[in-house]
Amino acid sequence: MNNKISVYDKDNFFELYQKLRANPISLNEIIEKPTMLSLLPNLKGKKLLDLGCGTGGHLQLYLERGAAKVIGTDLSEKMLEQAEKDLQKCGQFSGRFSLYHLPIEKLAELPESHFDVITSSFAFHYIENFPTLLSTIHDKLSSNGTLIFSQEHPITTCHKEGERWEKNDKKQQVAYRLNHYREEGKRNRNWFKQPFQTYHRTTATIINNLIHARFQIEQMEEPMLADQPQWHNEFKDLSHRPPLLFIKARKVEK
């Protein structure tokens, strides 16, 4: 039984989140999704797991790219209900997906395994024990399986106090303030007036955790829209710092 409750299942929060995600000009649509898809291998006939799958948007894209079967896990019941509805609308996906109400921290309890690819978007900075999670992911992957994930960049997760931005007389962002970077651990935050916790790890810690869990890092990305000038006015803050860190790593056997 899962005793943990998702913030997305609280009154009105899911509706607010849905409105945010419906915006075609968002960090998810302009940065996260294109970068994640660019890191994927050929999915034809593959079995995938998406940790923290939300409403199943990535699962649908994986199926459209030829995945044989996709599994999604999430802590939020409302997210999974929406994912079920959206995936069922596409008749060709019938029998090719499964959804589990399961927090990422309890991945070991998932009855499925031998995944060719495991992905996760915007989720790992919520995990307290990252080494344990990586060990479980390693066990769930097939030989030479691939892990691809995005999380808030450590430059962002390190923040503890004060204003995040240095601004000029016109209130324009001119520099991002970096503080408490070396101080790893829990951060208390607030979004849509809902308190929640994230966990800060330095980039070095993330990389070393992956190496110690027997992963070979194949690619890292810190997208900042350098090649997409049409979005520079909408996302001016990206000229100062990358909001997300992406890592693609391959399972290495003992």
From Swiss-Prot:
InterPro entries: Methyltransf_11, SAM-dependent_MTases_sf
Protein name: Uncharacterized protein HI_0912
GO molecular function term, any single one: methyltransferase activity
Domain of life per record: Bacteria
SUPFAM superfamilies, per the entry: S-adenosyl-L-methionine-dependent methyltransferases
